[in-house]
Amino acid sequence: MRVAVINGAPMAGKDTFVQCCQLLLGSVRVWNVSTVDFVKEVAKYCGWNGIKDPASRRFLSQLKDSLTEWDDIPFKKVAQVVSNFQRECSRLEQLGVGDGIIFIHCREPKEIQRLKETFNAVTVLVRREVVEKYEQSNGADSGVFDYEYDVTIDNNGDIPELHAKACSFLSELGLE
C-alpha cells in the first residue's frame, strides 16, 4: 500500500490526476480522501450549500482549524480511512489484484509533513500555471508552495498528457 499526500492551488487538477490514476489501476486500488472531507460534512450540517466560493473556502479553513485545535478530528478521520484502505489492500493482494494507493488531499505544510511521517507518504504537488495567479481567500490555499514536495506534476497540457504523467508516477512507485 502506498500513500500520497497531494496538494496544489485550487483548480490545479489534483482530482483529475487522481482520476487518471484510477483509470490506470481501477477505483478499487486508488482511493481519494481529503483532510477536509469530515469538515465539509460538519459544514453542511451547519447550512453550507456545498459551493466552494472564496467565502466558503475561508469558512471551511477556519472550521478545520477549530476542529484540529479542539481534538485533532480531521487527522483522526483521515487515519481511519487510511486504516480501512490498508485492510482493503491486504484483501486485494490475497485475491491477486495488486497493491493500491490512497491520495490524501492536504494544504497545510505542517500537516503535510505529519502525514508524510505518519504514513510514510510521498508528497505530490500538482501545478497549473493558469490558476496559480489567482489570489487565495485563506491561509491554507495561499500556503500551497510553502513546502518542498517529493514530486511535482506539471498540469499545463491536456488530459492525455496528464494521463501519461499519472502512468509514470505510478510506475515510479512500483504500481502497475
Regions found by a protein language model. Name each.
Residues 1-4, 30, 100:
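Extreme N-terminal starter segment of soluble prokaryotic enzymes
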Residues 34-100:
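ATP-dependent small-molecule kinase phosphotransfer cores
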